[in-house]
Amino acid sequence: MRGVFLDKDKIPYDLVTKKLNEWYTSIKNDQVEQAEIIKTEVEKELLNMEENQDALLYYQLLEFRHEIMLSYMKSKEIEDLNNAYETIKEIEKQGQLTGMLEYYFYFFKGMYEFRRKELISAISAYRIAESKLSEVEDEIEKAEFFFKVSYVYYYMKQTYFSMNYANRALKIFREYEEYAVQTVRCQFIVAGNLIDSLEYERALEQFLKSLEISKESNIEHLIAMSHMNIGICYDELKEYKKASQHLILALEIFEKSKHSFLTKTLFTLTYVEAKQQNYNVALIYFRKGRFIADKSDDKEYSAKFKILEGLFFSDGETQLIKNAFSYLASRKMFADVENFSIEVADYFHEQGNLMLSNEYYRMSIEARRKIKKGEIIDENQPDSIGSSDFK
């Protein structure tokens, strides 16, 4: 006898599956280095694993999920993500995915579509994944799903749905001390929704708590995200100096890791400095942020930087602003349209340009109407992701 190795020393697939689960845990915790190490170990074991189709399919799905993680944590090219998606899409078309594997496909597809800012496609994929949650026994996996859905709804400014899913995730994560990281991420969503509800002081309190937990956990990207969110909150409170201080702290960390939130931080910092009329400083951040957005083919932030260019760094080229809003609207990013159109309207009002000011105020009202219409549509669809009972 030679222990557990059977079939001419082939590695039992259940041992490889255990290693795959460890890999997935590292991915969910955004532990890039650990995930890379385990991925390499898994790939070596697969070469000598006893035949098992489900284990191979699970590997391919996790490889896709791994690429999604890298696209956030290391600003990896979206093209790499597209290639990984095409591979698993072909597998799904062949009808090889059932049970948990099918759940993972739609769950990861939702993340992929959200990364591409295909918001409706993301919600559609999550809706199918939710219909298969009965296949999921692990409470932590359910909480992870609730968190991801809450993030999309937060992005779409669907506050009711976002808060409900975030709270469902929090209820589970708080029961496990080892999931402090996930708890912090959920708190980000709750606090972001408080900002959307104009409850800035409560949001700031949440973000400051998140910063404290992130520092205790010594997780740099969460520390940076906390500083970024605190900066955004101070921006809303019109405490621009404090906003700049926290955004700069976030920037220092994101620049080292090349995190995907680097562009967002540079954009916000540009805007905050411009609001303080520190145009020379703002221009430095603007050039850096626009360069990164263009280089990484980040169409969302390329458009947003055009808004700032039209307002502060051009000779009154208002067409830049119109083009940017056209792009955001075409992607159904109505929350961004509403927020920025109000800011632009206020700017033109201060400049005495009442015609443009009124145009953008009207745009904000129309965007708000579309956001509200989206909530009504979801509530009336029985198979909607937002129509389940919240407890």
UniProtKB/Swiss-Prot annotation:
TPR repeats lie at residues 62-95, 150-183, 184-217, 224-257, 275-311, 338-371. GO terms for molecular function: phosphoprotein phosphatase activity. Inhibited by PhrI. One of its GO terms (cellular component) is cytoplasm. Disulfide bonds: none annotated. InterPro entries: TPR-like_helical_dom_sf (IPR011990), TPR_rpt (IPR019734). SMART domains: TPR (SM00028). It is found in: Cytoplasm. Induction: Expression is stimulated by conditions of low nutrient availability and high cell density. It comes from the Bacteria. Keywords: Cytoplasm, Hydrolase, Protein phosphatase, Repeat, TPR repeat. Pfam families: RapH_N, TPR_12. Its main location: cytoplasm. Its EC number is 3.1.3.-. Encoded by the mobile genetic element ICEBs1. Activates ICEBs1 gene expression, excision and transfer by inactivating the ICEBs1 repressor protein ImmR. RapI-mediated induction likely results from an increase in the specific activity of the protease ImmA, which mediates proteolysis of ImmR. In addition, is involved in regulation of sporulation. Acts as a phosphatase that specifically dephosphorylates the sporulation initiation phosphotransferase Spo0F and inhibits its activity. Belongs to the Rap family. Contains a small N-terminal 3-helix bundle domain and a large C-terminal TPR domain, connected by a linker region. This is Response regulator aspartate phosphatase I.
